[in-house]
From Swiss-Prot:
<dbReference type="GO" id="GO:0043884">
    <property type="term" value="F:CO-methylating acetyl-CoA synthase activity"/>
</dbReference>
<dbReference type="Pfam" id="PF03598">
    <property type="entry name" value="CdhC"/>
</dbReference>
<keyword id="KW-0533">Nickel</keyword>
<feature type="binding site">
    <location>
        <position position="215"/>
    </location>
    <ligand>
        <name>[Ni-Fe-S] cluster</name>
    </ligand>
</feature>
<dbReference type="InterPro" id="IPR045822">
    <property type="entry name" value="ACS_CODH_B_C"/>
</dbReference>
<keyword id="KW-0012">Acyltransferase</keyword>
<dbReference type="InterPro" id="IPR011254">
    <property type="entry name" value="Prismane-like_sf"/>
</dbReference>
<keyword id="KW-0408">Iron</keyword>
<dbReference type="GO" id="GO:0006084">
    <property type="term" value="P:acetyl-CoA metabolic process"/>
</dbReference>
<keyword id="KW-0411">Iron-sulfur</keyword>
<dbReference type="GO" id="GO:0016407">
    <property type="term" value="F:acetyltransferase activity"/>
</dbReference>
<comment type="function">
    <text>Part of a complex that catalyzes the reversible cleavage of acetyl-CoA, allowing autotrophic growth from CO(2). The alpha-epsilon complex generates CO from CO(2), while the beta subunit (this protein) combines the CO with CoA and a methyl group to form acetyl-CoA. The methyl group, which is incorporated into acetyl-CoA, is transferred to the beta subunit by a corrinoid iron-sulfur protein (the gamma-delta complex).</text>
</comment>
<protein>
    <recommendedName>
        <fullName>Acetyl-CoA decarbonylase/synthase complex subunit beta</fullName>
        <ecNumber>2.3.1.169</ecNumber>
    </recommendedName>
</protein>
<comment type="similarity">
    <text>Belongs to the CdhC family.</text>
</comment>
<feature type="region of interest" description="Disordered">
    <location>
        <begin position="436"/>
        <end position="466"/>
    </location>
</feature>
<dbReference type="GO" id="GO:0051536">
    <property type="term" value="F:iron-sulfur cluster binding"/>
</dbReference>
<dbReference type="GO" id="GO:0016151">
    <property type="term" value="F:nickel cation binding"/>
</dbReference>
């Protein structure tokens, strides 16, 4: 177990400290501000996000090691930051109390997203190592001068909303070197440890799953179902975390969900989950399959760590994580696909997941799992490499192998990926796709048979090729019907030969229709 202890502050960095509760704040604090978006033009500064390192972390410590309502700020404060720029950002909370235990750390940590969005002019997105904060210009105009004020407001909300927290202390860091050091040496090992706990447990081993509705302020119809084999989309809540949260706050955002009857063991559909999803989504959804990509997929909020996207050109699924900025082979970036995927929608063809879901033995098992996966960024693939079966690992392309659909198709042919000849899903040995080769062979055989049948009377003297007539279009014009159109004789195919045009797109910019003039007497 990773040791929980207070961080050491290096020499030579700027430090501010403040102890005790704040008398008043220069901003409103209310749930009405949840879901507030701060656009780039309205932003004073950005903290963390796509261009700067950042993380949030909660650690449970003994009572005597936590100084209640103390804030330590390491690095430049708001009044030293340049408007319009982005800065590193880490938020560490030490918590203590009789009921506080290590199992509650991720649950309390996830509520940081909840509480900080109560603050007017402060936007908090994502979680763990993906946090993305924006502070609005209006908040600065109203008197927000220091991140210490944000920390004090957040700690006050923690103690008011979660009274089992008897002591809380915050350390906020904007010094880039220290943020990166603590992210790699402290936060990531703790996150990894939390995720690994649930690997030995399976959906069949428990009687209930847990919900998470924290993101409904941004995605009102999203209902996250957390099972042993499927962690939350944000990656911050596992089944153990949901259980711990429901124990201390049974009416909170993490509630027990009875599994009910197992309706589809491969797709992961349960009657209890369906009933809960229907209720919590306001009737927007009636069915959810936890381990299916195409049929009644899980809804996606906007905090997902990874987006799965279907590419019909190769009949395969790609995955892209939040940290990959380049376009995927389908030509879309993560941020563009996020707009299609998020918002609490059930979208066939796009799916948001947490990185820990790649560990699952049931990873999109209804649709072939890893054997349907054809592309991932190298960074993501390396991160989850040990969970990819040996016989498919080298057949999954990265940006070094393919950046376009044409390049991806060639790569998949070269390595003989299962999608080329047809995917057999491991869970039940069923072949679920035909593959390209089989489809191409069937089409070739069909064309050959038809050509042979039409060539049979070719022993007779060949007739001159006749113009190919197209039937009248089912379109009525005032007073007359569109006449039949004729192709020029030069375009006609020779007798006994069938012309097959595949994958063609025909664009007609203009159709001009004229009445035929009657022949003048005398043949003129």
């Amino acid at each position: 177990m990773v040791e929980r202890k207070r961080i050491e502050i290096p020499e030579g960095v700027k430090v501010k400290e403040s102890v005790g509760e704040e008398a008043e704040f220069p901003f409103d604090i209310s749930p009405m501000y949840e879901g507030e978006r701060i656009r780039k033009g309205d932003m004073y500064v950005e903290l963390g996000g796509p261009t700067q390192p950042g993380f949030e972390l909660v650690m449970a410590l003994p009572m005597d090691q936590v100084e209640d309502m103390k804030v330590t700020l390491i690095g430049p404060d708001l009044d030293e930051m340049e408007e319009g720029q982005a800065y590193p950002y880490a938020m560490i909370y030490y918590i203590a109390g009789e009921m506080v235990e290590t199992d509650l750390e991720p649950v309390i940590e996830r509520r940081n997203h909840d509480f900080q969005n109560y603050i007017e002019g402060y936007m908090h997105l994502n979680q763990r190592y993906d946090i993305w904060i924006r502070i609005g210009k209006n908040a600065i105009k109203k008197g927000l001068k220091s991140l210490i004020q944000i920390a004090k407001a957040t700690m006050m909300l923690y103690k008011n909303e979660l009274p089992f927290i008897e002591k809380i202390e915050a350390v906020y860091i904007t010094d880039k070197d220290l943020v990166e050091k603590l992210l790699n040496e402290l936060a990531m090992p703790i996150f990894e440890e939390r995720d690994a706990r649930v690997e030995a447990l399976s959906d069949e081993d428990v009687d209930e799953f847990y919900s998470c509705t924290l993101c409904q302020s941004f995605a009102p119809t999203n209902v996250c179902i957390v099972s042993p084999d499927r962690p939350s989309l944000c990656g911050a809540i596992t089944w153990f975390d949901g259980r711990a949260a429901a124990k201390v706050d049974p009416e909170g955002p993490n509630r027990a969900v009875p599994k009910g009857e197992l309706l589809d063991p491969i797709g992961g559909e349960y009657s209890g989950v369906n009933e809960f999803a229907k209720q919590e989504s306001g009737g927007e959804y009636e069915r959810i399959k936890l381990h299916s990509f195409f049929e009644y997929p899980h809804t996606s909020c906007g905090c997902f760590e990874v987006i799965g996207f279907y590419m019909p050109e190769v009949d395969g699924i790609g995955w892209v994580h939040r940290g990959y900025a380049e376009p995927a082979p389908n030509g879309l970036t993560f941020s563009t696909m996020a707009g299609q995927t998020g918002g609490g929608k059930q979208v066939v063809g796009f799916l948001g997941i947490g990185i820990a879901y790649f560990r699952s033995k049931k990873f999109i098992q209804a649709d072939g799992g890893w054997y349907r996966t054809v592309w991932m960024p190298k960074e993501l693939k390396e991160r989850v490499a040990k969970y990819i079966p040996d016989d498919i690992r080298d057949k999954i392309a990265t940006e070094e192998d393919a950046k376009t659909l044409d390049e991806l198709r060639e790569f998949l042919k070269k390595v003989d990926h299962p999608v080329v000849k047809g995917v057999v899903r491991p869970v039940d040995g069923k072949k679920i796709t035909n593959g390209w080769v089989e489809e191409e062979e069937e089409e070739a055989e069909e064309v050959a048979e038809e050509a042979a049948a039409e060539a049979a009377p070719a022993a007779q003297p060949a007739q001159a090729a006749q113009p190919m007539a197209m039937q009248p279009m089912p379109m009525q014009m005032p007073g007359f019907q569109l006449p039949a159109l004729q192709m020029p004789a030069a375009s006609a195919a020779p007798a006994g030969v069938k012309l097959v045009i595949k994958d063609a797109k025909i664009t007609i910019e203009k159709v001009i229709i004229k009445k035929a003039e009657k022949e003048k007497k005398g043949g003129k």
